[in-house]
Amino acid sequence: MFNMKILVIPLFWGLVTGYKGNSSDSSAPRLLLVSFDGFRADYLKSYDLPHLQNFIKEGVLVEHVKNVFITKTFPNHYSIVTGLYEESHGIVANSMYDSVTKKHFSESNDKDPFWWNGAEPIWVTNQLQENRSSAAAMWPGTDVPIHNITASYFMNYSSSVSFKERLGNVTTWLSSSNPPVTFAALYWEEPDVSGHKYGPEDKENMRRVLKEVDDLIGDIVLKLKVLGLWDSLNVIITSDHGMAQCSKNRLIDLDSCIDRSNYSVIDLTPVAAILPKINVTEVYDKLKRCNPHMNVYLKEAIPNRFYYQHSSRIQPIILVAEEGWTITLNKSSFKLGDHGYDNSLPSMHPFLAAHGPAFRKGYRQSTINTVDIYPMMCHILGLKPHPNNGTLSHTKCLLVDQWCINLPEAIGIVVSALLVLTMLTGLMIFMRSRASTSRPFSRLQLQEDDDDPLID
């Protein structure tokens, strides 16, 4: 009986401790978040990436991260650090127009806090904690005062700054800042730039580019080891989106369908944001007949699974090209690789790998959502997350302090254990009662001389 209780107690203990947050201690946990833009998930299987594979071998891998729609750079990077869908955090595209304020946003005009204040990214939350600071090298939005706060250490964005300089700054801040940097973010433009230029199916060029990216991952690990940070620092390597192969033979020419005087294009391809200048229905009807390889949605009819309706920055009409197709004006330009398509497409998915004291070793998981990364990071850092669309339980099997089992399964195990305990208890009671049952003649009373032999 006692031994069975010992077996059951850990089950209850695991159920309780598996859902508590990171406990605080004298040494606050630290986290480095790294994004290699446009790193498609299946590059891991298609190319030899020894540094990344060694990183994964000692840590965890999520093979596919389902990102948010639209699968563009600015929106997904903000979803990673807020845990919100695009309609909630407000960065709904790389180019935007707000119908209320009449303001415009673009990759070269992104410094107005108005666009970013719809959410609080993790570097701001971390920055607000006592005796902590944040740092960032080129991560989208980190050079903007969001809610009047920037990270203690950041770099104004410039694509001309080398990875070596970015990494050098981040690791210096991590190793010698006061108050200590407990959260840092690092961004690099490749393999996205080359994916657009060559297309993901150009094996020769993409092999070369991905080798360069893999070497950069090796540089990260080596730098952290040299500085004595490797064993104590949690490191997440991920991306914002994947890449689809495009072709000059798969073009959707809007000029062949509707006159440009009827509308303005806010963002073009592969998800075009259309602001009608005439009757919305008239523009919609013309675009609906334009090309069978393009879905046309009124804002209120955008599929719910995209979570892409409830924002004044989403235009009245949205065009979504099929995978590999390009929306153009007068067939003016196209790229051999592109992204932004339906986020259910595997070609749009990035991956996630992580290493450090917060993560298991040698564990692989098939999928999580981009919005799940934020609550996981908050848990690691001991931060209270803001309301978000992510789910911590989706990532718990990646973490050493989480019980890797679903709550219904845990309840089932405990109930099963109790049933076994009940059965064993009943069996023991039955056996004991049977052992004490009266034997034959046990009721006969022996006299003092009854033990004398019957025969002399």
Curated annotation (Swiss-Prot):
Its EC number is 3.6.1.29. InterPro entries: Alkaline_phosphatase_core_sf, Phosphodiest/P_Trfase. It is found in: Cell membrane. Its main location: membrane. Residues 19-410 are extracellular. Keywords: Blood coagulation, Cell membrane, Disulfide bond, Glycoprotein, Hemostasis, Hydrolase, Membrane, Metal-binding, Signal, Transmembrane, Transmembrane helix, Zinc. Zn(2+) 2 binds at D192, H196, H339. Disulfide bonds join C257-C290, C397-C404. Substrate binds at N94, Y157, D192. It comes from the Eukaryota. Glycans are attached at N148, N169, N279, N330, N389. The active site is at T73 (amp-threonine intermediate). One of its GO terms (biological process) is blood coagulation. Its cofactor is Zn(2+). The keyword Disulfide bond applies. Residues 432-456 are cytoplasmic. It is an enzyme of class 3 (hydrolase). Zn(2+) 1 binds at D37, T73, D240, H241. GO terms for cellular component: plasma membrane. It is a single-pass type I membrane protein. The chain crosses the membrane at residues 411-431. Residues 1-18 form the signal peptide. Binds 2 Zn(2+) ions per subunit. Hydrolyzes extracellular Ap3A into AMP and ADP, and Ap4A into AMP and ATP. Ap3A and Ap4A are diadenosine polyphosphates thought to induce proliferation of vascular smooth muscle cells. Acts as a procoagulant, mediating platelet aggregation at the site of nascent thrombus via release of ADP from Ap3A and activation of ADP receptors. This is Bis(5'-adenosyl)-triphosphatase enpp4. It comes from Mus musculus. The lineage of its organism: Eukaryota, Metazoa, Chordata, Craniata, Vertebrata. The gene is Enpp4.
